[in-house]
A protein has these predicted regions:
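Catalytic cores of carbohydrate-active enzymes across secretory and cytosolic contexts
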Residues: 1-588
Length: 588
């Protein structure tokens, strides 16, 4: 549906003194044809920018060009993953900016340019995305490849990329002709932008000349979002690496400012020490982060997803008919609780048909649209426990018999250097081949990416998530499923602690002493709750889909999330100039 003037959301013109926001992220899912993301962090960043464009937030984003992409996944019949690069040309999608900036790496001067991609919102507001690129004439062959690979190479390569993103990005932002009042670091990869801001604050003078007022000026401009729930997950570099890459003076100043922990430069500490506001990405993750970093006040803003991107075409058509304001303000989806049950059933059936058609096209496997279908698709990391469903094969087969058939769809990539992750994929495919029968059909789909993810989250009947607590900071795939009325069956971690209404939006897998105990709870929920309702109570199932969309779809979206960032992080009341208000007079 085409928006009208009356559809416009509230305007950020109510913040006339706030200025522009610069958003920094190592990866951003910008466009399905641009392989500039690897997983959840990048998809979240892309959805954040899409909602910022829809809402008219004065924001520009900075990331790396990643000319070689992430990777194309290939799976052998035995389940072994191999990878191909995904080369692409920024000139095919973006406009080159004339500006050039330089950064110093190991005493080398590296030139950085930027490619601009315009993210256009629903009402025409543009959020420009600047992709930083070191493939510039005059740079050495090595330096020209610094921005090529997303999460490629060793820790030396990673630190050099973080210098380009943080310091190069901050300098590029300063050359583009619009004032930046807020710098948002989406994870610690961009933390070194604070160092560039401090150097700018000192006017090029020696770092040793800074004082508390200088640090306060940098801190006033910076906000930080952490996505990491365990200490080992934070980017850390040795003092030797830091000194060699950044220089001895910068490294000494960072150490003096308390940015080292256990002898390592900790990028999360850099970001926290220079930020006036920090947040985790779910309520529970905020608690975990405050426990890890007790000296810092860390808020919580729960993640979301961009509803128009992830709602399937059939569900969009249903919402356009019954709740036409849902795109303007996702909170209107709360009224999905009154949708006709048959409309929900028919919309999901069409989404499921589209998914199973894609499965047949990719694999030749013909699945039954009337059979209960579970979905499990995410990065192949061991803590996500993709094989938990196979803990007791005999019990899983009995559940398939009870259901009159069960279909399980898997997808997910392992990082090229993650051998345990690759072994996990191999194990899932091996078990799928062993267990598959007429009643139990298990398919692992190759090359999980944006388009396949959208089909899966919309088309399965139940979304399964089995992370080991507390490793799931938030998770967003279940939110995409909820926007399509698909309930979750999940461990209570991350966002699901907030989103689970037992039997209403899905089911919780109970905490157990070990994997076997939690697998037992998973089987219990399938046997006693999921299968009976799906098989014998279709009206109850339709009401649950409707409730899932109404309660979780209306809240776990980036429309709500970006509004929270603007109010709590970007433009908090105490930073705005107070408006003059005339005192009321009650004189007669």
């Amino acid at each position: 549906m085409q928006p009208t003037q009356a559809d416009r959301p509230y305007s950020y013109e109510t913040f006339p003194t706030a200025g522009n926001v610069a958003y920094f992220s190592m990866e951003i899912a910008i466009n399905p044809s641009m392989p500039t993301y690897s997983g959840g962090l990048g998809v979240l960043a892309g959805d954040t920018l899409r909602s910022a464009a829809d809402l008219g937030v004065p924001l520009a984003a900075f990331t790396l060009a990643h000319r070689k992409g992430y990777f194309q996944q290939h799976l052998s019949g035995a389940g072994d993953q191999t990878e191909d690069v995904q080369p692409w040309n920024p000139a095919d999608f973006c406009t080159e900016e004339p500006a050039r900036v330089t950064v110093s790496i190991e005493d080398r001067t590296v030139t950085v340019r930027a490619w601009r991609y315009d993210m256009v919102g629903r009402y025409g507001h543009v959020v420009p995305i600047y992709l930083l690129d070191t493939d510039v004439d005059g740079n050495s062959e090595w330096d020209r490849g610094l921005t090529d690979h997303l999460y490629g190479g060793d820790t030396n390569y990673r630190l050099q990329q973080e210098i380009v993103l943080g310091m190069g990005g901050a300098r590029m932002a300063g050359t583009l002709g619009f004032p930046i009042n807020v710098y948002h670091m989406n994870e610690g990869h961009a933390a070194l932008l604070t160092l560039a801001l401090l150097e700018s604050q000192l006017g090029g003078g020696p770092l040793g000349a800074f004082n508390e007022a200088d640090i306060a000026q940098v801190r006033r401009k910076c906000v930080f979002t952490t996505h990491t729930p365990v200490p080992a997950g934070h980017d850390r570099f040795s003092a030797e690496q830091a000194g060699r890459m950044l220089g001895a003076d910068r490294t000494a100043r960072l150490e003096k400012l308390g940015c080292f922990h256990e002898g390592l430069l900790n990028m999360t500490l850099v970001a926290l020490r220079f930020s006036r506001y920090a947040n985790g990405v779910a309520l529970q993750h905020g608690k975990v982060s405050r426990a890890m970093f007790p000296e810092f006040p860390i808020d919580s803003i729960t993640n979301g997803v961009h509803a128009p991107t992830w709602v399937s075409e059939p569900v969009q058509q249903m919402l356009d008919t019954h709740l036409p304001a849902w795109r303007r303000d996702n909170l209107y989806m709360r009224n999905a609780i009154d949708l006709p049950e048959q409309a929900m059933i028919e919309a999901h059936a069409r989404a499921k048909e589209a998914l199973l058609t894609e499965v047949a096209t990719r694999t030749g496997r013909v699945l039954d649209p009337h059979v209960l279908t579970l979905g499990f698709a995410r990065r192949a990391a061991t803590y996500k426990r993709a094989t938990l469903l196979f803990t007791d094969p005999d019990r899983l087969l009995k559940i398939a018999e009870q259901a009159g058939g069960l279909q399980i769809l898997y997808a997910g990539k392992a990082h090229p250097q993650d051998e345990p992750g690759k072994a996990l994929i191999h194990s899932v495919i091996e078990k799928a081949q062993t267990l598959s029968s007429e009643l139990l059909r298990i398919v692992y789909l190759e090359n999980y990416a944006w388009d396949l993810g959208a089909l899966l989250t919309a088309g399965v009947d139940v979304w399964v998530n089995t992370p080991r607590r507390p490793y799931e900071a938030s998770g967003t795939s279940g939110m995409k499923a909820a926007l399509n009325g698909v309930p979750s069956l999940s461990i209570l971690d991350g966002w699901w602690i907030e989103g689970c209404l037992e039997g209403v939006t899905g089911w919780a897998i109970e905490d157990g002493a070990d994997d076997a105990a939690e697998a037992g709870s998973l089987y219990d929920k399938l046997e006693k709750a999921v299968v009976p309702r799906y098989k014998s109570a279709p009206e109850q199932w339709a009401r649950m889909m409707r409730s899932t969309l109404a309660f979780n779809g209306s809240y776990f979206n980036t429309n709500r999330m970006v509004k929270q960032y603007t109010r709590n992080a970007y433009y908090p009341v105490q930073l705005l100039e107070p408006a003059h208000v005339e005192e009321p007079s009650f004189a007669g």
